[in-house]
Amino acid sequence: MNEESTRYVDVNYSDLDKELTYTTSEVAEILNENESTIRYWCDCFSDYIHIEREGRNRKFTKSNIDDLAFTKELLKKERLTIKQAQKRWEHIKTQPSQNTKVISTTETTSQENVLNEQALLKLEEIKKQFLNDISTQINNTISQQLSTALNAHNEALEQTKVELKDYISATIEDKLEANISNLKAHIDATTENTNKQIHQIYDKDVELVNDLKKHMEERKQQNEEQNNKKGFFGKLFKR
């Protein structure tokens, strides 16, 4: 198969194995705060709340969100200043056994519900993206093979199946073995159906060509007969 004619979408499935992370806007929604407030707290309490970055963007874990929720309790419920809240954090970090971070049960439950909803949405997005990518790869492969000659069709499709199987196996390994089997069965069924359609089209084309040849022969014979008649009458009137 021509390497340039077959391209696959690069799918990143790292989220299947890694802990879910959240953006600043998502954290702001979970904690019911403005994004600017979340960024301000992150800067003020960076010595106590360690948040990873991806480029210039922060990636919040569940633990980070819990720490920010505790910080919100200190500032909004206990009415502490930034410096007082920093001292509370310092005390917690230096003597963790004597201090615990307490957040109201109602707010914790609400945050847990939002977090669970966000996690389900992310998993659903991953699932949809995976299915869309696989569907796109199959449709592109079939469309490409339909435009090739009959002799190259089977060879090209077999190569495509091998590459698809290797690609999917290398990307998602054991987690999608069942999907690979279903995909192979789908491609086999599609191949059989495609071959039938191509043969049907080919047979119709042959029949059409034969009919056209027959029609041309009949027209040729009619023209010859008319020419013969014209020649006969021409000779008759010249006498």
Curated annotation (Swiss-Prot):
Gene3D superfamilies: 1.10.1660.10. One of its GO terms (cellular component) is host cell cytoplasm. Residues 217-228 have a biased composition (Basic and acidic residues). Residues 150-229 form a coiled coil. Signal peptide: none annotated. GO terms for biological process: plasmid partitioning; regulation of DNA-templated transcription. Keywords: Coiled coil, Host cytoplasm, Plasmid partition. SUPFAM superfamilies: Putative DNA-binding domain. Residues 138-239 are annotated as: Required to bind TubZ. One of its GO terms (molecular function) is DNA binding. Pfam families: MerR_1 (PF13411). It is found in: Host cytoplasm. InterPro entries: DNA-bd_dom_put_sf, MerR-type_HTH_dom. Residues 217-239 are annotated as: Disordered. Residues 229-239 have a biased composition (Low complexity). A probable TubZ filament regulator that is part of the type III partition system presumably used to ensure correct segregation of this bacteriophage. Binds to TubZ in the presence of GTP and Mg(2+), and to TubZ-TubR-tubC (tubC is the centromere-like site). The latter complex is reshaped from large bundles to rings by TubY. Modifies TubZ filaments formed in the presence of GDP to make them thinner and more flexible; in GDP and lacking the last 8 residues of TubZ makes rings without TubT-tubC. Forms homooctamers in the absence of the last 13 residues; the coiled coil domain is required for oligomerization. In the presence of GTP and Mg(2+) binds to TubZ and also to TubZ-TubR-tubC DNA; the latter is reshaped from large filament bundles to rings of 30-40 nm diameter. The coiled coil domain is required for oligomerization and for binding to TubZ, but the C-terminal 13 residues are not. This bacteriophage also exists as a circular plasmid prophage in its host. This is Regulator protein TubY. The gene is tubY.
